[in-house]
Swiss-Prot record:
Name under which the protein is recorded: Transcription factor MTB2
Chain positions covered by the region annotation Helix-loop-helix motif: 442-477
Gene3D superfamilies: Helix-loop-helix DNA-binding domain (4.10.280.10)
Keywords: Jasmonic acid signaling pathway, Nucleus, Plant defense, Transcription, Transcription regulation
Span list, region Basic motif: 428-441
Bias (Basic and acidic residues) ranges: 393-415, 425-439
Protein's cellular compartments: Nucleus
Chief place where the protein resides: nucleus
Matches recorded under InterPro entries: AIB/MYC-like (IPR045084), bHLH_dom (IPR011598), HLH_DNA-bd_sf (IPR036638), MYC/MYB_N (IPR025610)
The organism of origin for this protein: Solanum lycopersicum
Induction and repression of expression: Induced by wounding, feeding with herbivorous insects, infection with the fungal pathogen Botrytis cinerea and infection with the bacterial pathogen Pseudomonas syringae pv tomato DC3000.
Length: 579
């Protein structure tokens, strides 16, 4: 964070982000490049957030964005709420309010677009980004929603600061249903949020972070929804502990001295029988696909390292991204399902189950007993590879070199470079949801362009009028097809009737007379044109020569108007209605 800001840059960034957001970022001592301690694979978290944003419920409602603020450790060693993952989408047609539509007019301003891209570029470089992983150059247009979403990636919230920090400290959810008209700036990102047209913002604390949801609609508060989302995103930590308790149970069986026991023989967890629901969808039995997304990577059951003093301390292998975390420095917070995993000196009778916030003195102290180990995130692969190196404080903490060599291997070979902050903690395509939304809009616009090229007589150039004209044109074409099919059927039914043929023989010649309905005769259209122009046939002759039939008509006008050649030509050309 040694980058110098000119007065012009400060004015530009403050105009885009808001003065409060800019001052917060500049005064924050927490680097956005912090060591994130993931509570499960990124795919699971991203899929859950995508379900909240991209899968409408029965009422065709879904959130416009979802951000999970995860407990993270900064370079200075303090715990903060940092960017865990997120997903966003643009407002659908008819979903945004009138005020939102007015705000979207600014997208056509090229100067505004250049300013937004420049601000994102400045933030990217300010927070340790490089030209190699710069995503700003690939952006075409930055909408208000995308600007709010991308700028939020650079925020982190210590204890009691910002909306997420205050929500997590208080342990209570925040539901704002009228953000656009509210004068309360509950968060430093309020200006960006209002610029994106968000009407409803919800903050829900969990035991591992804060879930933030937003919508351009005004949504009334729902405690059932809050409870469902809270239990759903809090289930990560409970599943991790349940899996970690199994391999550690073997340590208890080996201990004959009760004072050296680390875990009781069985560790109960309160499992609710009621299946959580989000938008009325059952997450347990009704949707196996959603439960699969909640699956966590199984921790490696590696042997416990022996200290020279003879005591065994549990060291959880975190190479697959599973690691217990708690905001232990937040004294006012009581995270649920918390257990002291790193206190071998504590007697076994102090170990009690924690369900939905138990006794505060027995909470998880793993982060207090650990030094901030190095964590590197690989941004080169589609699946993140996290290699944290935990260090347990002890006066005999030097472990045998052979133990280190035993665990060294592929992880050391693929040790990645640490880069600046990128969304979604290192996926190869960090902005896939933003790009997908942009590609969807571009594809939709291309379809409208193609439709506008084939629809005649367009009344207006807007999309609604174009769709209406296309519907009218298709309806007219269908009517014409039905009329043509009816005429073909009528002609086919009359053609099966045999023509009335009369043959008369004279002395030197034979007279053949053929009679058939006018509609089936080849000259029927000519006769119809005569009728429309009020012309009567005086004489008709038929001659055949050189494989050609010559039909000659002698006509005269039966109306008051004079018969001209132009009128007959217009009638034969199908323009008799203009006469």
């Amino acid at each position: 964070m040694t980058m110098l800001w000119s007065d012009e840059d400060k004015t530009m960034v403050a105009a885009v982000l808001g003065t409060k957001a800019f001052d917060y970022l500049m005064s924050s001592l927490v680097s956005a490049e912090c060591s994130l301690m993931a509570m499960g694979s990124d795919e699971n978290l991203q899929n859950m957030l995508s379900d909240l944003v991209e899968r409408p419920n029965a009422s065709n409602f879904s959130w416009n964005y979802a951000i999970f603020w995860q407990i993270s450790r900064s370079k200075l060693g303090e715990l903060v709420l940092g960017w865990g993952d997120g997903c966003c989408r643009e407002a659908r047609e008819g979903e945004e309010s009138e005020l939102t539509r007015i705000l979207n007019i600014r997208l056509a301003d090229e100067a505004q677009q250049r300013m937004r891209k420049r601000v994102l570029q400045k933030l990217h470089m300010f927070f340790g980004g490089t030209d190699e992983d710069n995503y700003v150059s690939g952006l075409d247009k930055v909408t208000d929603t995308e600007m709010f979403f991308l700028a939020s990636m650079y925020f982190s919230f210590p204890r009691g600061q910002g909306g997420p920090g205050k929500c997590f400290t208080a342990g209570k959810h925040v539901w704002l249903s009228d953000v656009m008209r509210s004068s309360v700036d509950y968060c430093s990102r309020s200006f960006l949020m209002k610029s994106a047209g968000m009407q409803t913002v919800v903050l829900i604390p969990t035991d591992i972070g804060v879930m933030e949801l937003g919508s351009v609609r005004t949504i009334p508060e729902s405690l059932e929804l809050v409870h469902s989302i809270k239990s759903c995103f809090s289930s990560f930590l409970a599943q991790v502990r349940a899996k970690q308790a199994a391999p550690l149970a073997a340590v208890v069986a080996e201990k004959k001295n009760g004072n050296n026991s680390v875990f009781p023989s069985s560790f109960p967890f309160d499992q609710s029988k009621e299946n959580p629901k989000i938008f009325g969808q059952n997450l347990e039995s009704g949707s196996t696909e959603f439960r699969e997304k909640l699956a966590l990577r199984k921790p490696v059951d590696g042997p416990l390292e022996m200290y020279r003093n003879g005591n065994r301390a549990p060291i959880i292998n975190t190479q697959n991204g599973v690691r217990p975390v708690s905001w232990a420095s937040f004294g006012n917070v009581k995270p649920g399902n918390s257990v002291d995993l790193y206190s071998p000196q504590a007697p076994p009778n102090n170990l009690r189950e924690f369900v939905n916030g138990g006794r505060e003195e027995l909470r998880l102290n793993s982060l207090q007993h650990q030094k901030p180990g190095g964590m590197q995130i690989d941004f080169t692969n589609s699946r993140p590879v996290v290699s944290p190196v935990p260090t347990v404080e002890s006066e005999h903490s030097d472990v045998e070199v052979s133990c280190k060599e035993k665990h060294a291997g592929p992880a050391d070979e693929r040790r990645p470079r640490k880069r600046g902050r990128k969304p979604a903690n290192g996926r190869e395509e960090p902005l896939n949801h933003v790009e997908a939304e942009r590609q969807r809009r571009e594809k939709l616009n291309q379809r409208f362009y193609a439709l506008r090229a084939v629809v005649p007589n367009i009344s207006k150039m807007d999309k609604a009028s174009l769709l209406g004209d296309a519907i009218a044109h298709i309806t007219d074409m269908q009517k014409r097809i039905r009329d043509a099919e009816y005429k073909l059927e009528k002609r086919g039914s009359t053609s099966v009737d045999a023509a009335d043929i009369n043959i008369e023989a004279a002395s030197d010649e034979v007279i053949v007379r053929a009679r058939c309905p006018l509609g089936t005769h080849p000259v029927a259209k000519v006769v119809e044109a005569f009728k429309e122009t009020q012309v009567s046939v005086v004489e008709s002759k038929l001659a055949v020569g050189n494989d050609t039939v010559y039909h000659t008509f002698v006509v005269k006008s039966s109306g008051p108007e004079q018969l001209t050649k132009e009128k007959l030509m217009a009638a034969f050309a199908g323009e008799s209605n203009s006469l």
